[in-house]
């Protein structure tokens, strides 16, 4: 059987479209399930933004496999209810609350100090909390909501916990201690420069809140790569991921017309529920495959697939962002000068 050139081109284009949709939405058949999570007894995990959505499912499944799990968030009353839900489902669960307000650098610092006072080890850190497309507003620290919540505060929190992570890694096999950054394919919405160093707040950018969200997610991915390079000698793995397009509260700030379009169109069938949405996070946090295949610094897409970054970046740019961000917190006296 022979095909015309146009017919072959159509097939290639169709395949590309299907693969892109699978990468964006996570509609591929999972090669990995919750049953593949190894026993985590004796391990300590921390999940930010775990009161609902994929953060809740991530914390629940880590607890189900025996880990002691810290739920990090702002509203203690809300989290007490979440902890009860987890206890009701997993009777043997070891769940703790850690107060963390990502809109306040001082709260981030205090949260890290509180955790360090309670625990000597940390095996799994999942930087999951996020905010998407809110109206333009600055935090008390002077940063736009998305860049602070999604990137800056997670950067500070992670850097403060690095001594604990390194100490934990001394007694573990390479790759058993992991930092997971829940990013998004929306990193493609970042400004042309990727990161706008003159003003991270992007107050006048043409695409507004979407570009600000994209920049915050791109920064997360680049930070993950920077950490992977810095921490490999300690046996600590840092990875990032796009969890898929998920039905969660994250979209609460999205334009009403956009949500209605999703709900009333074929795109509603492309949305993942939080259970499937959490699969990639849990794969990144626990799968032995990642250590076995030396996937430190990797970027994953839904569901539990190795992804490809579609924006060019080099080591110099990654390092520039790392040092630029570190300097912010050096000046605020939250971090010591970077070596």
From Swiss-Prot:
Active-site residues, Swiss-Prot/TrEMBL: 213, 217
Binding site for NADP(+): 54, 78, 101, 128, 213, 217
Top-tier EC class: oxidoreductase
Entry-linked InterPro entries: NAD(P)-bd_dom_sf, SDR_fam
Single annotated GO MF: oxidoreductase activity
Entry keyword annotation includes Thylakoid: no
EC number: 1.-.-.-
Sequence intervals crossing the membrane: none
Keyword Oxidoreductase: yes
Family per record: Belongs to the short-chain dehydrogenases/reductases (SDR) family.
UniProt keyword list: NADP, Oxidoreductase
Protein name: Uncharacterized oxidoreductase C736.13
């Amino acid at each position: 059987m022979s095909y015309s050139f146009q017919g072959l081109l159509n097939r290639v284009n169709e395949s590309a479209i299907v693969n892109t949709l699978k990468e964006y939405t996570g509609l591929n058949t999972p090669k990995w399930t919750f049953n593949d999570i190894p026993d985590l007894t004796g391990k300590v995990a921390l999940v930010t933004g775990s009161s609902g959505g994929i953060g809740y499912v991530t914390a629940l499944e880590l607890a189900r496999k025996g880990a002691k799990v810290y739920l990090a968030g702002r509203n203690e009353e809300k989290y007490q209810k979440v902890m009860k839900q987890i206890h009701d489902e997993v009777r043997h669960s070891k769940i703790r609350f850690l107060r963390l307000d990502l809109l306040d650098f001082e709260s981030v610092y205090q949260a890290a100090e509180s955790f360090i006072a309670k625990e000597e080890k940390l095996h799994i850190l999942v930087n999951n909390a996020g905010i998407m497309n809110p109206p333009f507003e600055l935090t008390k620290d002077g940063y736009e909501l998305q860049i602070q919540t999604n990137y800056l505060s997670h950067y500070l929190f992670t850097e403060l916990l690095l001594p604990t992570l390194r100490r934990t890694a001394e007694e573990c096999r390479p790759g058993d201690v992991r930092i997971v950054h829940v990013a998004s394919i929306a990193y493609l919405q970042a400004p042309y420069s990727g990161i706008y160093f003159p003003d991270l707040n992007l107050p006048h950018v043409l695409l507004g809140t979407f570009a600000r969200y994209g920049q915050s997610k791109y920064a997360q991915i680049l930070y993950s790569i920077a950490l992977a390079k810095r921490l490999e000698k300690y046996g600590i793995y840092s990875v990032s991921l796009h969890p898929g397009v998920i039905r969660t509260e994250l979209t609460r700030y999205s334009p009403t017309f956009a949500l209605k379009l999703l709900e009333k169109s074929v795109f509603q069938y492309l949305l993942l529920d939080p259970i499937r949405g959490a699969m990639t996070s849990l794969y990144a946090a626990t799968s032995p495959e990642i250590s076995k295949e030396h996937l430190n610094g990797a970027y994953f897409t839904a569901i539990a697939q190795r992804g490809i970054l579609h924006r060019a970046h080099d080591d110099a740019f990654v390092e520039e962002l790392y040092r630029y961000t570190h300097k912010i917190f050096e000046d605020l006296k939250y971090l010591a000068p970077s070596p």
